[in-house]
Swiss-Prot record:
Sites where the protein binds Ca(2+) 2: 546, 548, 550, 552, 557
Glycosylation-annotated residues: 174, 286, 302, 397
Name of the molecule in the record: Peptidyl-prolyl cis-trans isomerase FKBP9
Residues annotated as domain EF-hand: 488-523, 533-568
MF annotations from Gene Ontology: calcium ion binding; peptidyl-prolyl cis-trans isomerase activity
């Protein structure tokens, strides 16, 4: 079609624009520049690397003639074009046009025939002397000299251990191509990737890229394809010759040869006893994973964890880690998974997880323990010692082994009063009050099987708790011989019945009996068992004599204690 003057001027303007700005202009059928023309239609903000001669690239393109007719497109094949740059594998114009490109950069490239297919063209595809226009998007770039590239963007302040060959690790990752396209993510599966390092379970680049990492560290590992899935890709999501970028966060690390480790021990100055196999422990703990994630806490339940140690009641690592502790000790026990919950995990604990227990030992005892008595003060005259049947008045402070105060008579402002051996206190306390003199001060430690047992006292004494009583004996009233609730302090009148039966009617009623016994006690001629209700004792004595239960005692029914079978009362 012939062009008039106006049309010629328009074409000249467009060609000038193409030369000066690199903007592709529509061709109106006349000759164009013989120079390669490049327009950068998009350049990413970050460009850590550009294409150099000798690099291998993966890119998408759309190839058109200058009239807009498409002759080829990588998008139609759903595959990038993969090739070395500067090695004669491309037309000269494309070899030049790709140099200096960044990943994700987009270029519009116009290639004259002399830098394309020349006067011969490509039969059936590209006519001779064709100017070619390519819309190019660079997806990937690497060089055969590349190694694994590591960029650490977070490292915890404390890094006591790093990944070594043969370690087992648990980590999260996002896997992308160089252009940012996500191909896989452990986060999407909500499950860590768990594997050995350095023994061929991973692609070579990841085997190298993970070495030296700390738990809690985050790094970006860029892997060239020859250290990843190579020319063939993985057959699913990863194409051949693809560089891979892994954004990795290391959560866990151990070696199958690991044993438990004990850290951050805080041992009280006074440690008279250390735990042994067979002991029963009460302790608080926080249980976390290596990355600090809390999975359990006894504090949240407001109740200690109570267990035997060394007998398989807890995981092997804790069985071992709790040996040799002192009461009041704090320690951190790090348990590898083969001494914890293994490959399967348990509840909120993932498989193959290293566990960290921060424990505080509250108390422990052994089922074979008896009470422990430590006397702190004895008065100069300490000859009268407490025994079964004695009536005692004493003060005490009751606490747990960790010092937690449970009860105090001093706070209440009154003594605690009991008859020793009558079952009015726990067995360990009964034992701890024996052979004590007035004014003496002692500490009695009572194991739970001699205290309040596994159940404890709801809201007051924890189950299986060892108890500590600081005691001061203030008063001791000697009791009666075992089996007696009343005794005479002198000779008994041979006319006892007649003395009780003051009205001489041959019958003694309860009122008469009670009045007589109390009179004997008041004058010191008789003594009731101390610490018991006097009226109840007298009533029981009367009932024992009232053999036919008619509410009165006759001379025939009346007998003294030494005239009865054992344990009968007056």
């Amino acid at each position: 079609m012939a062009l008039g003057a106006r049309g010629w001027r328009r074409r000249s303007l467009l060609l000038l624009l193409l030369w000066v700005t690199g903007q592709a202009a529509p061709v109106l059928g006349l000759a164009v520049s013989s120079e390669l023309q490049i327009q950068q239609s998009f350049v990413p903000d970050e460009c850590p690397r550009t294409v150099h001669s000798g690099d291998f690239v993966r890119y998408h393109y759309v190839g058109t003639f200058l009239d807009g007719q498409k002759f080829d497109s990588s998008y139609d094949r759903d595959s990038t074009f993969n090739v070395f740059v500067g090695k004669g594998q491309l037309i000269a114009g494309m070899d030049q046009a790709l140099v200096g490109m960044c990943v994700n950069e987009r270029r519009l490239v116009t290639i004259p025939p002399n830098l394309a297919y020349g006067s011969e063209g490509v039969s059936g595809v590209i006519p001779p002397n064709s100017v070619l226009h390519f819309d190019v998007l660079l997806v990937d770039i690497w060089n055969s000299e590349d190694q694994v590239h590591i960029q650490t963007y977070f490292k915890p302040p404390s890094c006591p251990r790093t990944i070594q060959v043969s370690d087992f690790v648990r980590y999260h990752y996002n896997g992308t191509f160089l252009d940012g396209t996500l191909f896989d993510s452990s986060h999407n599966r909500m499950k860590t990737y768990d594997t050995y390092v350095g023994i061929g379970w991973l692609i070579p680049g990841m085997d190298k890229g993970l070495l030296g990492m700390c738990v809690g560290e985050k790094r970006i590992i860029t892997v060239p394809p020859f250290l990843a899935y190579g020319e063939e890709g993985d057959g699913k999501d990863i194409p051949g010759q693809a560089s891979l970028v892994f954004d990795v966060a290391l959560l866990d690390l151990h070696n199958p040869k690991d044993t438990i480790s004990i850290e951050n021990k805080v041992v009280p100055e006074n440690c008279e006893r250390r735990s042994q196999s067979g002991d029963f422990l009460r302790y608080h703990y926080n249980g976390t994973l290596l990355d600090g994630t809390l999975f359990d806490s006894s504090y949240s339940r407001n109740h200690t964890f109570d267990t035997y140690i060394g007998q398989g009641y807890v995981i092997p690592g804790m069985d071992e880690g709790l040996l040799g502790v002192c009461i009041g000790e704090r320690r951190r026990i790090v348990v590898p998974p083969h001494l914890g919950y293994g490959e399967k995990g348990r509840g909120s604990i993932p498989g193959s997880a290293v566990l960290v227990f921060d424990i505080h030992v509250i108390d422990f005892h052994n089922p074979s323990d008896s009470i422990s008595i430590t006397s702190h003060y004895k008065p100069p005259d300490c000859s009268v010692l407490s025994k079964k049947g004695d009536y005692l008045k004493y003060h005490y402070n009751a606490s747990l082994l960790d010092g937690t105060l449970l009860d105090s008579t001093w706070n209440l402002g009154k003594t605690y009063n009991i008859v020793l051996g009558s079952g009015q206190v726990v067995l360990g306390m009964d034992m701890g009050l024996r052979e004590m003199c007035v004014g003496e001060k002692r500490t009695v430690i009572i194991p739970p099987h001699l205290g309040y047992g596994e159940a404890g006292v709801d809201g007051e004494v924890p189950g299986s708790a060892v108890l500590v009583f600081d005691i001061e004996l203030l008063e001791l009233v000697s009791g009666l011989p075992e089996g007696y609730m009343f005794i005479w302090n002198g000779e008994v009148s041979p006319n006892l019945f007649e003395e009780i039966d003051r009205d001489g009617n041959g019958e003694v009623l309860l009122e008469e009996f009670s009045e007589y016994i109390h009179a004997q006690v008041a004058t010191g001629k008789g003594k009731l068992a101390p610490g018991f209700n006097a009226e109840m004792i007298v009533k029981n004595m009367f009932t024992n004599q009232d053999r036919n239960g008619d509410g009165k005692v006759t001379a025939e029914e009346f007998k003294l204690k030494d005239q009865e079978a054992k344990h009968d009362e007056l």
